[in-house]
A protein has these predicted regions:
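N-terminal lobe of the biotin/lipoate ligase/transferase fold
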Residues: 15-179
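C-terminal regulatory/effector modules of DNA-binding transcriptional regulators
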Residues: 3, 11, 125, 137-138, ...
Length: 224
């Protein structure tokens, strides 16, 4: 196997997040044969992917002559790289995800990855931060299992004085996501970097940049 959760067969690569997406979208059992044919892989490869998902904490029911079925519990959400990737349908943003159960700061991590040459669109996500920061260096309380902490690294082709617009772009993205689960009239954006629900802050955004006078090396925009 190429790496845990991904197997090569006939030039195709099947990742466990793809299996997870297939099971989650299904209304009933999905047969092993259907998974084999859909991804062009062997039954052994499918079995290994299922076992990897179970190791990650997913409950998957298997029945002879029926296949596999994902047992989901809304009160026990699994927060992992696999879970995040299974929802991704973007072309560039978030196609390279770095996930930490615990880290100091996702912004610091994203800047380090940018310096190492990671591609634009790299997304750093953490379940807990021990050195989270807000604007003007203010501390940011970031316990595990309570919130979302993420930083997106981009290499935009624009002048440095335009980079601050990415803070608003992130705020709009968070706002639109929140509006999918909260009545739109309750949500808002408080300039320049907060998202609010019922006039209470639910998200702060911090944008940092490495640049020269005429060009940007990279920008990291963190949201928590």
């Amino acid at each position: 196997h190429k790496f845990a959760g991904c197997w090569q067969n006939k030039g195709l690569c099947m990742k466990k997040e793809e299996i997870l997406r297939k099971l989650r979208d299904a209304d009933d059992y999905v047969s092993g044969q259907e998974l084999c044919e859909y991804y062009g892989v062997s039954r052994t490869a499918v079995w290994k992917a299922i076992k990897q998902l179970e190791k990650d904490g997913y409950v998957i029911e298997a029945q002879n002559n029926r296949g596999y079925r994902l047992i989901e519990n809304d009160t026990d959400v699994i927060f992992s790289k696999t879970a995040i990737e299974s929802y991704m349908d973007t072309v560039q943003i978030g196609r390279n995800i770095v996930f930490h159960k615990e880290t100091g700061s996702t912004n610091i991590d994203a800047k380090a990855l940018a310096e190492k040459g990671e591609p634009s669109g790299t997304l750093v996500v953490a379940d807990m931060q021990t050195a989270g920061r807000g604007r003007r260096g203010h501390g940011w309380v970031a316990p595990a299992g309570k919130n979302i902490y993420m930083t997106l690294m981009l290499r935009p082709d624009c002048q440095p004085d335009k980079a601050s617009a990415l803070t608003l772009v992130m705020a709009i993205a968070v706002y639109e996501a929140v509006c999918e689960i909260v009545p739109k009239e309750c949500c808002g954006i408080k300039w320049p970097n907060d998202v609010v629900v019922n006039n209470k802050k639910i998200c702060g955004i911090l944008t940092e940049m490495s640049a020269e006078p005429e060009c940007i090396h990279y920008v990291v925009t963190g949201a928590g």
